[in-house]
A protein has these predicted regions:
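Short, acidic, metal-binding catalytic loop of nucleotide-sugar glycosyltransferases
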Residues: 22-31
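Glycine-rich, basic loop-to-helix element that forms the pyrophosphate-binding segment
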Residues: 61-78
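Short aromatic/hydrophobic "clamp" motif used to bind/position activated sugar donors
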Residues: 83
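A short, conserved alpha-helix in the catalytic core of glycosyltransferases
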Residues: 165-216
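Non-catalytic, C-terminal membrane-associated alpha-helical segments of glycosyltransferases
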Residues: 231-239, 245-303
């Protein structure tokens, strides 16, 4: 039995997946297995993965699925004592997995999961521990008033291991038996907040979540806005409404905010990013009061 089962979901992007796999190989000494969910891969890219990385277990995914569903395809096959959830657009530059395994073994039995410090390519901190996410915090986040890189009660409390509250799905290590007992990722969510929801559930189950600020992983997030944003954002918002219990005040707040955004983009040239953002705002307005699932929302607005 391997010590760690590494689970990576990749949407037909070998250009970012392969460097991630190379970095795992270069910086990991604990025993591990690697399961890659090949989401909508072309036959050519699938063959390239199989040829270049024969040590990877390929988990095909050929239907429309969100992050939770895709991860769960692989999670149901894991054999390791721990699971490492890792984005395909991440790079290891230190023995991250070894360190997290050593950390969690030294923590109390109630410790269920631990995250590293997650940094952007330029070195800025994305998250290093996460506070509880409440409807109020989500509203502030919507206004760009939440900065998870700033120290607070739950973030960066020490130069090493400290207790936090919830998780960032880009990278975290979790005890497999606890993850299984939690039901893996909640498949009601299509694009977020499955990671936050998992952290909250672990706390509700009586477990604790931790972070180690002394180890970090690079998250190559960001880039240009694609046309899929007009389907991804409303699905993401709908998932958040489900997680927060469908509060009417929050739905009204988001509707008004997106109405103002749509109004702004109405006066800008309707092309490129402007048009994507205008449609995104309009689609969120339609989705926020909907009773459809996030997956149904995504299907409805997918260009």
């Amino acid at each position: 039995m391997p010590e760690v089962s590494i689970v990576i979901v990749c949407m037909n992007r070998p250009d970012i997946l392969f460097p991630c796999l190379d970095s795992i190989k270069a910086h990991t000494t604990v025993s591990y297995e690697t399961l890659v969910v090949t989401y909508l891969f072309t036959p050519e890219n699938l063959e390239a993965l199989r040829t270049r990385y024969p040590w990877v277990t390929i988990v095909p995914s050929t239907e429309l699925r969100g992050f939770s569903e895709n991860n769960n395809l692989a999670l149901r096959q894991v054999t390791g004592k721990f699971c490492l959830i890792l984005n395909d657009d991440t790079l290891l530059s230190m023995p991250l997995i070894d360190s997290l395994v050593a950390d969690i073994k030294s923590l109390p039995e109630t410790a269920a999961a631990i995250s590293p410090c997650i940094r952007f390519k330029d070195g800025r901190i994305q998250t290093c521990g996460r506070a509880p996410w409440t409807p109020r915090r989500y509203a502030l986040h919507y206004l760009h008033l939440v900065d998870e890189s700033k120290p607070n009660k739950w973030n960066m409390l020490s130069p090493s291991v400290f207790r936090t509250y919830t998780l960032n799905g880009a990278c975290f290590l979790i005890k497999t038996e606890v993850f299984r007992a939690a039901g893996w990722f909640d498949e009601r969510f299509f694009f977020t907040p499955e990671d936050i929801a998992l952290g909250h559930k672990l706390n509700d189950m009586g477990y604790t979540v931790w972070a180690d600020s002394s180890v970090s992983v690079t998250h190559l997030a960001g880039g240009s806005v694609s046309a899929l944003e007009q389907a991804i954002k409303p699905a993401r918002v709908r998932g958040s409404m489900i997680f927060y219990g469908e509060p009417l005040w929050l739905k009204r707040f988001i509707w008004c905010y997106e109405a103002l955004r749509a109004f702004k983009y109405f006066f800008l040239p309707r092309k490129g990013r402007n048009e994507i953002m205008r449609k995104s705002a309009l689609n969120v307005m339609k989705a926020v009061f909907s009773e459809e699932t996030p997956k149904e929302i995504f299907k409805r607005f997918k260009p």
